[in-house]
From Swiss-Prot:
Organism: Escherichia coli (strain K12)
PANTHER family reported in the protein's UniProt record: INNER MEMBRANE PROTEIN YBCI-RELATED (PTHR35531:SF1)
Spans traversing the lipid bilayer: 13-35, 55-77, 84-103, 148-170
InterPro entries, alphabetized: YdjM-like
Keyword check for Transmembrane: yes
A UniProt-annotated Pfam family: YdjM
Topology Cytoplasmic: residue spans: 1-12, 78-83, 171-173
Protein name: Inner membrane protein YbcI
Chief subcellular location: membrane
Cellular component, GO annotation: plasma membrane
Name of the gene: ybcI
Protein's membrane topology: Multi-pass membrane protein
Organism domain of life: Bacteria
Phylogenetic placement of the source organism: Bacteria, Pseudomonadati, Pseudomonadota, Gammaproteobacteria, Enterobacterales
Length: 173
C-alpha cells in the first residue's frame, strides 16, 4: 500500500486543481478522509483477522461496492454540509475512495485488492506494479527501503497529481 498520507494526494490534487467553487473545503476534507478510510481495515489485525481474509487488509473496504456505497451514504447524510450538489459530491467522494484501491493495486507487495467482493474473494493487482509497498512500521521509513518507498510515491503519485492539479488550475483561469 502507499502511505496513508499519499492516499490523500488524489482528492487533494483534484480538489485544489478544480478550486473551492467546484470542490468546497468541506467536500475536499471529506474526500481526503474517504481516500484514507479503507486502511482502517488494518485494525482487524488486532482482532486476529488474517490479512487474506475478506475482512482483512485490502478486503471488503477496498471493494468496488464499498467505493460506491460509502460515498452515497455520505452524500445522503451530509450533502448540505458539503455545500455542493448531490452528483458533484457523490462523484468526488467516489473518485476519492476508489483511488485508494487503485493505488494499492499498483504496489509491489501485499496480496492484491478485493475489488469484486461480495461476488468473489479473489484479490487483484493492476497489470503493472510501480509503487514500492509501504511498511507498516514507522521506524522502517528511516531505512534505505523506506526512502525508496517515499521516492516511488513522489514519482508515481505526487508528481502526476501536482501536474494534474496544475493543468486543472490553468484550465479554470
Amino acid at each position: 500500500m502507499p502511505t496513508v498520507i499519499t492516499h490523500a494526494a488524489v482528492p487533494l490534487c483534484i480538489g485544489l486543481g478544480l478550486g473551492s467553487k467546484v470542490i468546497p473545503p468541506r467536500l475536499l476534507f471529506a474526500g481526503i478522509i474517504l481516500a484514507m478510510l479503507p486502511d482502517a481495515d488494518v485494525l482487524s489485525f488486532k482482532f486476529g483477522v488474517a490479512y487474506g481474509n475478506v475482512f482483512g487488509h485490502r478486503g471488503f473496504t477496498h471493494s468496488l461496492v464499498f467505493a460506491f456505497v460509502v460515498p452515497l451514504l455520505c452524500v445522503f447524510i451530509g450533502r448540505r454540509w458539503f455545500r455542493a450538489g448531490l452528483i458533484r459530491c457523490w462523484l468526488f467522494l467516489t473518485v476519492s475512495l476508489l483511488s485508494h484501491s487503485l493505488l494499492d493495486s499498483v504496489t509491489t507487495g501485499g496480496k492484491g485488492v478485493g475489488w469484486l467482493w461480495p461476488w468473489s474473494d479473489e484479490r487483484f493487482f493492476a497489470p503493472w506494479q510501480v509503487i514500492k509497498v509501504a511498511p507498516f512500521a514507522l521506524s522502517r521509513y528511516t531505512t534505505p527501503y523506506g526512502h525508496q518507498v517515499i521516492i516511488s510515491e513522489l514519482m508515481w503519485v505526487w508528481l502526476p497529481g501536482m501536474l494534474l492539479m496544475g493543468m486543472l488550475w490553468w484550465r479554470r483561469r
